[in-house]
Amino acid sequence: MAEKRNIFLIGPMGAGKSTIGRHLAEQLHMEFFDSDHEIERRSGADIGWVFDVEGEEGFRIREEKVIGDLSEQQGIVLATGGGAIKSRETRNKLSARGIVVYLETTIEKQLARTQRDKRRPLLQTEEPPREVLERLAQERNALYEEVADFVIQTDDQSAKIVANQIVKLIGM
């Protein structure tokens, strides 16, 4: 089996994937990508607009394509969107093309980290944020665990400390 040279960060919104990913890439001298930012770059529109115009299904199609393209590269750190693992194709590509690290966090931390963020379409609904996050956790946690090579709890730890833990875990 070829050595896995990419690192893919998965987990719910507010777990710290983007922030931790930047620290990790810097520490390992790897290129960092955020799938949501790449979707925005390619579409010329922000995520909220994509959700408004194309719905979640249209967004997920774009996300699957972006992650498929990026994961073909070597030597990258990729922070995925929280729902990226809903796609079996995406889960298979992540597993086959790199080391998958599930950044786990509590609902309380997610609420604290996302409460002022208006750029999260799934939280911009009439449904209370706690209920949304609990529902998403029920739908997704088993999928995160299925694809993860490693699981790291991010609550009450700085992004730099979590990045250091990842480096030790994966032996890079």
From Swiss-Prot:
Substrate binds at residues 36, 60, 82, 140. Binds 1 Mg(2+) ion per subunit. It catalyses: shikimate + ATP = 3-phosphoshikimate + ADP + H(+). Pfam families: SKI (PF01202). Keywords: Amino-acid biosynthesis, Aromatic amino acid biosynthesis, ATP-binding, Cytoplasm, Kinase, Magnesium, Metal-binding, Nucleotide-binding, Transferase. Mg(2+) binds at residue 18. CDD domains: SK (cd00464). It is an enzyme of class 2 (transferase). GO terms for biological process: amino acid biosynthetic process; aromatic amino acid family biosynthetic process; chorismate biosynthetic process. Gene3D superfamilies: P-loop containing nucleotide triphosphate hydrolases. It comes from the Bacteria. It is found in: Cytoplasm. Its cofactor is Mg(2+). PANTHER family: SHIKIMATE KINASE, SHIKIMATE KINASE 1, CHLOROPLASTIC. Belongs to the shikimate kinase family. This is Shikimate kinase. It comes from Aeromonas salmonicida (strain A449). The lineage of its organism: Bacteria, Pseudomonadati, Pseudomonadota, Gammaproteobacteria, Aeromonadales. The gene is aroK.
